[in-house]
Amino acid sequence: MVKKTGQLFHIDFGHILGNFKSKFGIKRERVPFILTYDFIHVIQQGKTGNTEKFGQFRQCCEDAYLILRRHGNLFITLFALMLTAGLPELTSVKDIQYLKDSLALGKSEEEALKQFKQKFDEALRESWTTKVN
């Protein structure tokens, strides 16, 4: 989706709650989140060696993750309240547990950030699969 300001945004509760698409029993989405080389091309302003811009983007992602994590209990409570709302992506406590695991609420901030960085690297490394999807 595109705002009037030109900013892109997309809300997909399915992804943040661990509901990934499959077809004929094959998991179509195999990365923690979508981070294509096309996105990276735009972030780097079309320059292949512009690691400064990409570094800034990555730092913003890490900062945003930690902010979300700090408010994790609020998110868990709000999603728990929505269990009966009829959202197809939010039907069981298992969906909420996926969110807890993603935010690494049982871990220290350092461990949680390490987990996020690993997921970020995996999304980047396996981004070719999103083109196949």
Q: Whereabouts are the PLM-identified features?
A:
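ATP-dependent kinase catalytic cores of phosphoinositide-metabolizing enzymes
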Residues: 2-133
